[in-house]
Amino acid sequence: PQGREGKTHHDLTPPSLMHRLIVLLCTFSLLFPLSGRARRDTQVEFVTTAGNFTVRLLRDTPVHSRHFEQLVRAGYYNGLLFHRVIRDFMIQAGDSTSRNAAPGVLLGEADRKETLAPEIDLPYHYHRRGALAMARESDEVNPGRRSSATQFYIVWGKTFTPARLAPVRARVDEATGQEGTITSSMAEEYEHTGGAPHLDGQYTVFGEVVKGLSVIDKIQRVATDDNDRPLEDVRILSARVVGERR
C-alpha cells in the first residue's frame, strides 16, 4: 500500500535503494530461467517410410503432452505402422502389435488399459488440418471421453461450405451439450483450410504438425483394405524429441 502512494519510495536512502534493486534483480534472474523452461514447446520429429514430419506438443494439455513425450523418449513408436488411414479424414498409429503384424491383419484393437483424463480445450485447440489428437473408445463404453494412452491420429479432413458445416455444428452442439461449440473463427478455418469438425469437443487435441504437412497428405491418400489398413505398410522408422522452442 505504501508503495502505491509513493511514500516509501521517496524515503529510501541511496544505499537502501541499491540493496532493494540488487535483491530484485537476483530474484528475476532466478525466476526467469524457470519460467522460460515452462513456456517452451516440445517438438517431435517422425521419420516414416513416406517421409518426415514434425509435430509441436501443446503446453496447455500437459497430461497428454508429457505422456506422449515420455513414450517418444522411450522409443515406443519406433517401428509401428499407421494402421488406420481414411482419405479426407485422418491417419492413425500407436498399436504396439502393428510392429510385427502380418499383411492384412486387423489392427487397432490392442491398447493399454491405462487411459488419460480428457484435456479438451475449445475453442483454442480443435480438429483443424494438421491437428494431433489421441484416439479413444466410443461414448457407449467411455462416457468420460478418456483418451487412449498410446494411439494417436493426425487430422487431414476436408473443407466445408457454410451450408455443409451448419448440420455438423448442430450435431457437435448436441454431442457436447453446449451451444456454439464451433465458433465463427473455427468455422472460417474449416471453410478455407479444412479439418474434421465433427470430432470437436469429444477428443483431446494436444499438438499440431508444424513441418511436413505434405507427408500427412501423402499418407492419407494411400490405398487401403476394408479395415482402413494401408495395403502397403506405412511405418514409423523413428520418433524423437528434436528440441524445444519458446
Where are these regions (language model features)?
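Charged/polar low-complexity intrinsically disordered segments
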Residues: 2-7
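Intrinsic-disorder-associated, low-complexity terminal segments enriched in Asp/Asn/His/Tyr and depleted
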Residues: 9-11
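Intrinsic-disorder-associated interaction segments
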Residues: 14-15, 179
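Positively charged n-region of N-terminal signal peptides that target proteins for export
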Residues: 16-21
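Bacterial N-terminal signal peptides
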Residues: 22-31
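Cyclophilin-like peptidyl-prolyl cis-trans isomerases
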Residues: 34-246
